[in-house]
């Protein structure tokens, strides 16, 4: 994981390291990213993130920061939806970034909602409802390399997602960039 400034966020150095390293050691996946598109101009090399209306962002800094907002995860961003049917998508730009393992992390708590994750032919539902505020990650596995994953909220209860990760279960190098 490289944590840095806007050059890191834009994947300028890490993208080149990832490309060279994965050619040499195997393509392990794109790695951890903020869920969705947390800000205007958000760049991702190798994958394209998308989202429908209905999501708001709490950020570690800048105009999107809210001290009263949901907890922030490892990526420094949390995407929250309070409507049923809000979607986030992540698609591999080419076969170098296909994946068979997807991990989704978010904030848990008494009033939190649930999501449906679709990875190829695999569909699973996960609830973020819990007795106390905490965090949880859920994994979805496919028997095939997939090029797209979709996350959809299932109710009007809030869902606050802190990160998602794509990997290949066959192993290889993963370099994540967070800035």
What does each model-found stretch correspond to?
Residues 1, 19-20:
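N-terminal hydrophobic targeting/anchoring segments and the immediately downstream early-domain regions
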């Amino acid at each position: 994981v490289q944590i840095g400034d806007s050059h890191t966020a834009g994947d300028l150095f890490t993208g080149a390291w990832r490309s060279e390293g994965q050619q040499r050691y195997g393509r392990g996946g794109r790695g951890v990213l903020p869920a969705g598109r947390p800000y205007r101009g958000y760049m991702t090399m190798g994958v394209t993130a998308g989202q429908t209306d209905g999501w708001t962002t709490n950020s570690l800094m800048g105009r999107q920061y809210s001290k009263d907002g949901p907890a922030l995860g490892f990526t420094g961003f949390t995407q929250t939806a309070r409507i049923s049917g809000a979607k986030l998508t992540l698609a591999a730009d080419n076969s170098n970034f296909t994946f068979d393992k997807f991990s989704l992390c978010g904030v848990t708590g008494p009033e939190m909602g649930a999501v449906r994750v679709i990875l190829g032919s695999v569909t699973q539902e996960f609830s973020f409802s819990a007795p106390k505020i905490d965090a949880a990650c859920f994994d979805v596995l496919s028997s095939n390399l997939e090029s797209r994953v979709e996350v959809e909220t299932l109710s009007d209860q809030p869902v606050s997602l802190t990160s998602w990760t794509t990997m290949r279960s066959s192993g290889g190098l993963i370099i994540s960039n967070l800035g």
